[in-house]
Regions:
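Active-site rim helix/loop that mediates acceptor-substrate recognition in acyltransferases
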Residues: 28-51, 63
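Short hydrophobic/aromatic beta-strand element in the GNAT-like acyltransferase core
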Residues: 47-51, 61, 77, 111, ...
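Conserved beta-strand in the GNAT
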Residues: 51, 57-66, 72-79
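Conserved catalytic-core motifs of GNAT/GCN5-like acyltransferases
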Residues: 109-113, 123, 128-145
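Short amphipathic alpha-helix that is part of the acyltransferase structural core
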Residues: 1-33, 53, 58
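Conserved acetyl-CoA-binding loop-helix of GNAT-fold acetyltransferases
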Residues: 80, 86-99
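A conserved beta-turn-beta hairpin within the catalytic core of GNAT-like acetyltransferases
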Residues: 66-76, 85, 104, 140-142
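Residue-level recognition of the GNAT/N-acetyltransferase active site
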Residues: 11, 67, 81, 113-115
Length: 152
């Protein structure tokens, strides 16, 4: 099938495709300054990161990390190609990661750190806003910290 949806683990050879996804979402969802943060994450901080493919096209990516004590799962770097937003693919990718986090029995909560531009998506997925920090990511890009309410 040409339009088979696959979620697989990130490989270093995916880096350019992921950066291209970020650029397609800049400045609509991300600040231009965040590209260097993503590069650093992909090269140094990655714990679990996934690529969403539709057929042969990379249409999304996202991962998760843990707090130092391993009791909090942290959803990280959700990026979806603009042409594939609002088609449930972001929900599929998020749910995949939440199910993966459930495999870690020490996790007591799941959070996401997003912006005012994307927090409504997470609200619809069961996250509740717990903190706002203005201009956190860059001027005009505020931090919206949210906790998952459907845990465990």
């Amino acid at each position: 099938m040409h339009n088979e949806l696959i979620i697989r683990e990130y490989k270093s050879s995916d880096k350019q495709a992921i950066l291209n996804l970020l650029r397609l979402n800049t400045p609509g969802c991300f600040s231009p300054q965040e590209e260097s943060d993503l590069v650093y994450f992909l090269e140094n901080e990655i714990e679990y990161y996934f690529v969403l493919e539709l057929g042969t096209q990379t249409v999304g990516s996202g991962g998760f990390n843990f707090s130092p004590d391993k009791t909090t799962g942290i959803i990280s770097w959700d990026i979806l190609h603009p042409d594939f937003q609002r088609k449930s693919l972001g929900s599929i990718l998020l749910n995949h990661r939440i199910e993966k986090i459930r495999e870690f029995k020490d996790v007591q909560t799941v959070i996401v750190r997003t912006s005012q531009l994307s927090y409504r998506f997470y609200e619809k997925q069961g996250f509740t806003l717990i903190e706002i920090v203005e201009d956190y990511w860059a001027p005009g890009f505020h931090l919206y910290k949210m906790a998952y309410t459907r845990w465990p």
